[in-house]
Amino acid sequence: AYRTRAYVNGTSSNSIAIPGYNSQPNVMYKTHVQSFGWQNWKQNGDCSGTFGKSKRLEGINIKLSNCGYSGSVQYRTHIQSYGWESGWKQDGAMSGTSGQAKRLEAIQIRLTGEMAQHYDIYYRVHAQHFGWLGWAKNGESSGTAGYAYRLEGIQILLVPKGAAAPASNYGGMIQNNPNTFIAR
């Protein structure tokens, strides 16, 4: 973060610090996990959900904070028995289910407006039997189809346009499969 100074009578000796704008936006997300319920908000590549505990993700909320650009984050999930949600959720609305014991099987996430012009949104999931899949970005599908396998965890990152994609061992979690979406 940086600070902006306001000068009184044009001299620096009379300046006061005003909190400035931190130019790095954040992506924040939380998941509803089988038996555990809603987890706390995670951000910027932290793992939300579980892995190694055989618990399904049932719902997800995603939002942006600290944005210097217009636009939003939109997302939709592939839900057990229902398939892909017909509409996109955005800005913290819940995608998936709560209280229905339905697993999430895949997800798509995209940015809109100026955010989409300046950032890519990367995400990857921990899928039952496959582990961490490769990174998907900008609306691509991440997860499985035709297997009836649950999502167990997710990581989401904002990356400035033109910057390198996240590594396959981001956050110490090693990618098990380079595919982002596995269909039967």
Where are these regions (language model features)?
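Lectin-type carbohydrate-recognition ectodomains
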Residues: 22-184
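Extracellular fibronectin type III
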Residues: 9-23
